[in-house]
Amino acid sequence: MASPAAAELYAAQGWDTVTLDLEHGSIGFDAAVEILRAIRGSGVVPLVRVPKGDPTWVATLLDAGAMGITAAMIDTREDAQRLVDACRYPPLGDRGLSRQTRAAMLHGLDYTETANTRISVFAMVETVEGMRNLSSIASVLGLDGIYFGGVDFEMSLRRAARGDPAGAGDTAAATASARKAVVEACRANSILAGMNAANPAAALALFESGFRFITLSSDAVAMTSQARAWVTDARNLVTAKV
């Protein structure tokens, strides 16, 4: 949600990291900076998800204090290399240098020397093309991990079969196979496999299958599901007394 206050409260609930979603969230840059401040003020690592690894977005958000980038729709090795180049200072990348950014001022004069080890970089693989190029993407030096977008991968399977409703086949089985492939590719390259879990039980299942960077639902889902449960319980309790 586009609210620094909500982000601050959410971040204070014991999370290791909180990700600000600029791919699907209706959040502008000014609001994003305030939300990053709120997350960091709660002692939590602030991460940002960006569309397609846009270099301008990436550089600006890192300068504003984001401690990690997860870039959507990374389909090729070239996409992954552009992402790393935007996130890493030389010699690992091409990130531009300024010692007067918020990030540099927060982390001290040695920020540019330490940022390459402090910043996390995840490439989202979530299409048929991305899975086809998984091995070459995962081998890009400077990536910390591959984040698998299971929902978009299923959509990609359906798009690939456009005009042939049966052509997508068993999308659930194909997605399960892709999840396994992501874990194997990450292990082969000594990087982390990541994915979102809808609930704690799903998070455990991902962990047991080899995922080590696991995000859990969202602030909007947490708020609405809890509110819905309270309303339902209250109505049921009152109805039982009538």
Which sequence ranges carry the predicted segments?
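Expand to "…catalyze enediolate/carbanion chemistry for C-C bond making/breaking, isomerization
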Residues: 1-242
